[in-house]
Amino acid sequence: MEGSDLLLAGILFLFAAVVAVPIAARLGIGAVLGYLLAGIAIGPWGLGFISDVDEILHFSELGVVFLMFLIGLELNPSKLWKLRRSIFGIGAAQVLLSAVVLAGLLMLTDFAWQAAVVGGIGLAMSSTAMALQLMRDKGMNRTEGGQLGFSVLLFQDLAVIPALAMVPLLAGNGDEHPDWLKIGMKVLAFAVMLVGGRYLLRPVFRFIAGSGVREVFTAAALLLVLGSALFMDLLGLSMALGTFIAGILLAESEYRHELEIAIEPFKGLLLGLFFISVGMALNLGVLYTHILWVVMSVVVLVSVKMAVLYGLGRFQGLRRTERLPFAGVLSQGGEFAFVLFSSASSQKLFHNDQMALLLVTVTLSMMTTPLVMKGIDRLLARHFNAPDEDAEMPYVEDDKPQVIIVGFGRFGQVIGRLLMANKMRITVLERDISAVNLMRKYGYKVYYGDATELELLRAAGAESAQSIVVTCNDPEDTMRIVHLCQQHFPQMEILARARGRVEAHELLQAGVKQFSRETFSSALELGRKTLISLGMHPHQAQRAQLHFRRLDMRMLRELMPVHTDNAQISRVREARRELEEIFHREMQQERRQLDGWDEFE
């Protein structure tokens, strides 16, 4: 691609993402499917703006590379060692069982046995990028099903290496006498990377961090990711595996969080580019001429993989409620199929349209996954939200709650217990299945599901409830629920949890007057006790605490219109000085009033 063509392609990618992803989010089908649809629209079989799909697809694999580095940062070697049985046990079983079944089915459709073996192995792989993104979106990272899913994906990454080595042998082009010297050099180079990374990376990053220049640290992080990817690629190994190992080597370092911050923006953009490229690679011509074969293939592929994964999840001891999400999130074909099938095609293993049919099947299966997960969510919601005839009468008997609580973590539990102690009728909306099970045992009226969906809020009684308390961990979810309630349930008073000043400003801008910053009150209380320990009278300390709370809220409201404007930093400092002077004057006036508490803020 020439420079101008590359610039035009970049603009088209960004434009397609900006248009398609918000529309997909509004339709509730997820950002990943939005990226795929955007790729179809601008690709050679859509509007035809971009035709060089192969080059862009190869470049976009960097999104998976960055993602695997960040995953490695979250896993230290001890955690990885604990996963060894699920990686080489369940992971190996999934690839083997899925490949055998799918290869057998391909042989029934006139594939030669060599092509069927390659096709079965390729289709057995799942999309690391899509599965991990969906697991994060669904909060599966903290569940046993999510950990098992990650183990399966990691084994698939490892399995790609011998699978690629097998292709020339199946084609009859393999060497009778392998070059053991070449193999030994690759193993030695890999060992050097491990040892060098173990002992050199931390001193290098310590030296770079000592410069105090953030841009240099970001450049070093990018150099590490891209360098390890290139090194593994030169060895003929998986680029994603190389960056994953680099991440693990730094997982216990003091620079872990700084590296995550430096890499995160690049990961998001490149992952979006990857999904757009996959959408562009969809051959609509083959789809049109073989529509029945392709549709049946997608259904069979997703069904076979879900059945295998569900059975393995049951064998592993996953709870019934975690088996379906575990099976669904890995049910698609993956990006490694593109690499494997391309290698097989170069060895003349496929005939006629066989490779194109397999690639279309993989691409469409990736597009079904967000819809499959949405269906699983609805199925689980119907299961959990259905009334249990054998259950004891719950503490909350009225079908019309006074208060709806969204999220029942540590913050939400305190609110719920306080309301229950005062005989208030509450309904809890929670996405964590284990929390739903526990809450129902204690007699709470709980709905499983995503509170950003209008129908779930209606089912929970939002049309008649007096208040809703939003305690989500995700600020974006909080704002979605706030806007949804303002639009459809204006009678409800909205109370929300803010994790900090930025979220507090956003809530104020949205018109939410009742909110609580999660650390502010506890910090003020500890500050009051500190003043008392320094000799201040308890009444004065209480009054100082209340004054500070009132003045801080005033500053929060005054600075709300300019909180996103970097040019207004001087205005922030000026306002802070003004409020400190006001606080000092008020405290001076009441310095001699040692008795009596202020009633209100």
From Swiss-Prot:
One of the record's GO cellular component terms: plasma membrane
PROSITE patterns: RCK_N
Residues in RCK N-terminal domain copies: 400-519
A GO molecular-function annotation: glutathione-regulated potassium exporter activity
Transmembrane segments: 5-25, 29-49, 55-75, 87-107, 115-135, 152-172, 181-201, 207-227, 230-250, 268-288, 291-311, 324-344, 356-376
Role summary: Pore-forming subunit of a potassium efflux system that confers protection against electrophiles. Catalyzes K(+)/H(+) antiport.
NCBIfam families: 2a37 (TIGR00932), PRK03659.1 (NF002973)
Summary of subunit composition and partner proteins: Interacts with the regulatory subunit KefG.
Assigned protein family: Belongs to the monovalent cation:proton antiporter 2 (CPA2) transporter (TC 2.A.37) family. KefB subfamily.
Protein name according to UniProt: Glutathione-regulated potassium-efflux system protein KefB
Gene source species: Cronobacter sakazakii (strain ATCC BAA-894)
Gene from which this protein is expressed: kefB
